[in-house]
Amino acid sequence: MKASLAFCVVLLVFGSVSEAKFDDFEDEEDIVEYDDNDFAEFEDVTEDSVTESPQRVITTEDDEDETTVELEGQDENQEGDFEDADTQEGDTESEPYDDEEFEGYEDKPDTSSSKNKDPITIVDVPAHLQNSWESYYLEILMVTGLLAYIMNYIIGKNKNSRLAQAWFNTHRELLESNFTLVGDDGTNKEATSTGKLNQENEHIYNLWCSGRVCCEGMLIQLRFLKRQDLLNVLARMMRPVSDQVQIKVTMNDEDMDTYVFAVGTRKALVRLQKEMQDLSEFCSDKPKSGAKYGLPDSLAILSEMGEVTEGMMDTKMVHFLTHYADKIESVHFSDQFSGPKIMQEEGQPLKLPDTKRTLLFTFNVPGSGNTYPKDMEALLPLMNMVIYSIDKAKKFRLNREGKQKADKNRARVEENFLKLTHVQRQEAAQSRREEKKRAEKERIMNEEDPEKQRRLEEAALRREQKKLEKKQMKMKQIKVKAM
């Protein structure tokens, strides 16, 4: 039934194609010519179907009123396909189905698709590798902190510079009227007055003055807060501190008597007594109140002897200390000033440190850290106090009893020092003797002449015997004295 239906379809298609062919001819000669080469044309079409593109033919039918577009080359292919399909269907219908032929076919996996196509893998990109602002929050914080540090450095450095210049402009006239040289930087062999501050770093400025009677010179050090350091600025928010002005006057030896004296806040004096060599040795008592002399409760006194306190606390000095107590940290006069205590890992030093007759002043700048250039004018009276103290130290002299007491105190300190360092000095002397013996023995061993070497050994032996005899004689004398 299927075969007959397919055959009818083929006949209908073939008839429509042949009818369209005859419609294309205009005269009978063309029809005759077409009849002669009818099958030849189909042969040419089958041979050229691979290389030539097919032509489209439009046919119209009156009964169905439909327009169809057919390819000439496809007609034969469709006909052949129908015939092949008929024959294949006939073969499949005639042949029986063999179950054993497809045994195990469903069990084999289809590997052709996996061989031809690579497997698709989806990679999860970490969050920190994605291009978003959230991935750079650490870098943003670092850059922000760096910019804040740089801005604070510039602002803090400029503010310290303005404060230093404001202080110098305020005190310049007073300094130039009392000192011949103001502002020597020490770069030239000859002392020259530069008339400006010497910047040590971003928060410390120095000024050297000299050329005045009774003193070798005066070093002024402006110690400002580390405003250029952001961490220091944050720390000061928790614990406010003040800028300071430290003045060190080195007196001539003949223009200052022998005494140690200090006045200042109780907290500052306790700290200085622990740190400074002279205050710890000559002022061993606790700081005493200055209410007896009319000083405020915030100030205390350390003195080697009462005579020094009576002589230094005159009316003008008390006036300075009373009216500017909030700006005074400490005032320290000493003929035995050697700086802070020397701390050595191997013990006490073998000799007393060098001392200088010195006046030390430490003043607090108003503002408790929030200082402005106009606040520097409030420190000008304190510089007048320094000038007055220089003249006062030159005029003040101890009486005979005070002088003897001061000398005893210095002898006592020296004796205590020698006792503390006696063992160390003995060890140092023993090491020097051993080093000398070692050098002598090496000199004898390096001698090439045997006779000369023998004489050197005999001389060394005689020296040792003489030293031993002297030591025995001293021991006998000590025993005789003891009897």
From Swiss-Prot:
Signal peptide (residue range): 1-20
Region (Disordered): 41-119, 423-483
Lineage: superkingdom: Eukaryota
Annotated transmembrane regions: 136-156
Listed InterPro entries: CCDC47
GO biological process, one term: ER overload response
Assembly: Component of the PAT complex, composed of WDR83OS/Asterix and CCDC47. The PAT complex is part of the multi-pass translocon (MPT) complex, composed of three subcomplexes, the GEL complex (composed of RAB5IF/OPTI and TMCO1), the BOS complex (composed of NCLN/Nicalin, NOMO1 and TMEM147) and the PAT complex (composed of WDR83OS/Asterix and CCDC47). The MPT complex associates with the SEC61 complex. Interacts with VCP, HSPA5, DERL1, DERL2 and SELENOS.
Job description of the protein: Component of the multi-pass translocon (MPT) complex that mediates insertion of multi-pass membrane proteins into the lipid bilayer of membranes. The MPT complex takes over after the SEC61 complex: following membrane insertion of the first few transmembrane segments of proteins by the SEC61 complex, the MPT complex occludes the lateral gate of the SEC61 complex to promote insertion of subsequent transmembrane regions.
Protein name per UniProt: PAT complex subunit CCDC47
Annotated source species: Canis lupus familiaris
Lineage: Eukaryota, Metazoa, Chordata, Craniata, Vertebrata
